[in-house]
């Protein structure tokens, strides 16, 4: 899992691991950190999805302290929320704060109280923070929701993010308007379980209703991108919206996890393999250019070779291109951790095979797009992305954050090449 590092002139550094919501929250941390005036400090915004993510964070902390012995280190994020004592016991760490505390700057001060992590399950509302810029990024992130009310057997996210809490539509609209005025052409709608949006708000507005309001009230917004969506929560209204709204980008990341129905049942997922295939095929029939990403767990407890092959078949049948594959990682206290485990070496081997399957699917997707006319959103390092999230390598500098028309002409090392038109 790649970490993102942000620095400024005050010798303040933020190292972000994990999801898009963490990226969004790191921008809030950056703003608060600048206001705090703290010098020679690093905040590690951690992830708790896998043991590997936690190991990466600990290694990065030790390396940072070794390189700068006077550096003050604050650890926060989902891993800190789940295991505050683990970080509190590290000699390199000066302060540990929870997921709610990290958004409040007074918790950044180094005091005798090394750990400040409160009960996230008691939080009833998600505070709204206006983020005006995203360091070095061409697209902006909008948080519409936090927390999760589901109980997948492998997941600890509900325990580190709390119950599902939604941000009112009016507040979201105001934020999007603000970001458009700042020059952003694309916003990414993000949260922990975005398609669960609204059930806790007065009148229970749906995710689709919220998206419609944003698109209607901010006509200047050119591109909207949705983060991970849950197949089980896609109703007819939402499907119609993403199928026919050209301003919603034709790239959707699905929380699939497995292509075997028995494994999905043991995970306590609310969809089956047929519903994934049906959704992808139905949407592709309307928007042929659409691409799909998916989270896949390799080697979930009790997964047999036949069950694993069902997942491989699903990738082909649903035509999933952008795969996030993780070897199953036991999370203490979860029901899945008590199930019969698949050996580690088999998990890793299956993950390797799935990643290759994903690479093959993506390469075929690239080939089908040679000669296609697209619009590119320009990013850092001469990289851009198409509407359906194909990464494109540019041969010259173009203004970051702007949109250019181009023709895709070839493939080169995981990217497509283009000529401007």
Curated annotation (Swiss-Prot):
Residues 134-364 form the Radical SAM core domain. [4Fe-4S] cluster 1 binds at residues 19, 47, 78. One of its GO terms (cellular component) is cytoplasm. InterPro entries: Elp3/MiaA/NifB-like_rSAM, Methylthiotransferase, Methylthiotransferase_CS, Methylthiotransferase_N, Methylthiotransferase_N_sf, MiaB-like_bact, rSAM, rSAM_horseshoe. The keyword Transferase applies. It is an enzyme of class 2 (transferase). Residues 10-112 form the MTTase N-terminal domain. Keywords: 4Fe-4S, Cytoplasm, Iron, Iron-sulfur, Metal-binding, S-adenosyl-L-methionine, Transferase, tRNA processing. Disulfide bonds: none annotated. Its EC number is 2.8.4.5. The keyword tRNA processing applies. Its main location: cytoplasm. GO terms for molecular function: 4 iron, 4 sulfur cluster binding; metal ion binding; N6-threonylcarbomyladenosine methylthiotransferase activity; tRNA (N(6)-L-threonylcarbamoyladenosine(37)-C(2))-methylthiotransferase. [4Fe-4S] cluster 2 binds at residues 148, 152, 155. It is found in: Cytoplasm. Catalyzes the methylthiolation of N6-threonylcarbamoyladenosine (t(6)A), leading to the formation of 2-methylthio-N6-threonylcarbamoyladenosine (ms(2)t(6)A) at position 37 in tRNAs that read codons beginning with adenine. PANTHER family: RADICAL SAM PROTEINS, THREONYLCARBAMOYLADENOSINE TRNA METHYLTHIOTRANSFERASE. This is Threonylcarbamoyladenosine tRNA methylthiotransferase MtaB. It comes from Rickettsia prowazekii (strain Madrid E). The lineage of its organism: Bacteria, Pseudomonadati, Pseudomonadota, Alphaproteobacteria, Rickettsiales. The gene is mtaB.
């Amino acid at each position: 899992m790649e970490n993102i590092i942000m620095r400024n002139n005050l010798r303040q550094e933020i190292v972000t691991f994990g999801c898009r919501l963490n990226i969004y929250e790191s921008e809030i941390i950056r703003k608060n950190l600048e206001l705090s005036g703290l010098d020679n400090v690093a905040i590690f915004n951690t992830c708790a999805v896998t043991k590997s993510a936690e190991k990466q964070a600990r290694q990065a902390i030790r390396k940072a302290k070794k390189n700068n012995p006077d550096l003050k280190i604050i650890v926060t994020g989902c891993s800190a929320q789940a295991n505050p004592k683990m970080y509190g016991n590290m000699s390199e760490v000066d302060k540990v704060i929870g997921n709610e505390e990290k958004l409040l700057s007074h918790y950044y001060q180094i005091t005798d109280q090394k750990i400040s992590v409160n009960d996230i399950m008691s939080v009833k509302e998600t505070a709204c923070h206006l983020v005006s810029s995203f360091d070095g990024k061409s697209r902006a992130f909008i948080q519409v929701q936090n927390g999760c009310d589901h109980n997948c057997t492998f997941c600890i996210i509900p325990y580190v993010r709390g119950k599902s809490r939604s941000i009112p539509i009016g507040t979201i609209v105001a934020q999007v308007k603000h970001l458009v005025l700042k020059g952003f052409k694309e916003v990414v709608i993000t949260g922990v379980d975005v398609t669960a949006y609204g059930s806790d708000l007065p009148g229970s507005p749906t995710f689709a209703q919220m998206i419609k309001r944003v698109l209607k009230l901010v006509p200047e917004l050119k591109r909207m991108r949705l983060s991970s969506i849950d197949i089980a929560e896609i109703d007819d209204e939402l499907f119609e919206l993403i199928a026919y709204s050209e301003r919603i980008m034709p790239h959707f990341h699905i929380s699939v996890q497995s292509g075997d129905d028995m494994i999905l049942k043991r995970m306590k997922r609310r969809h089956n393999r047929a519903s994934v295939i049906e959704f992808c095929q139905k949407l592709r029939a309307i928007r042929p250019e659409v691409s799909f990403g998916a989270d896949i767990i390799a080697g979930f407890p009790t997964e047999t070779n036949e069950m694993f092959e069902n997942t491989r078949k699903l990738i082909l049948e649903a035509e999933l291109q952008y795969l996030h594959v993780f070897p199953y990682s036991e999370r203490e206290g979860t029901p899945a951790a008590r199930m019969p485990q698949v050996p580690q070496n088999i998990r890793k081997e299956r993950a390797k095979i799935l990643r290759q399957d994903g690479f093959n699917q993506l390469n075929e997707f690239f080939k089908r797009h040679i000669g296609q006319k697209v619009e590119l959103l320009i990013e850092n390092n001469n990289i851009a992305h198409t509407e359906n999230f194909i990464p494109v390598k540019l041969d010259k500098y173009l203004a970051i954050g702007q949109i250019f028309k181009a023709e895709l002409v070839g493939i080169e090392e995981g990217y497509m090449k283009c000529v401007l038109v």
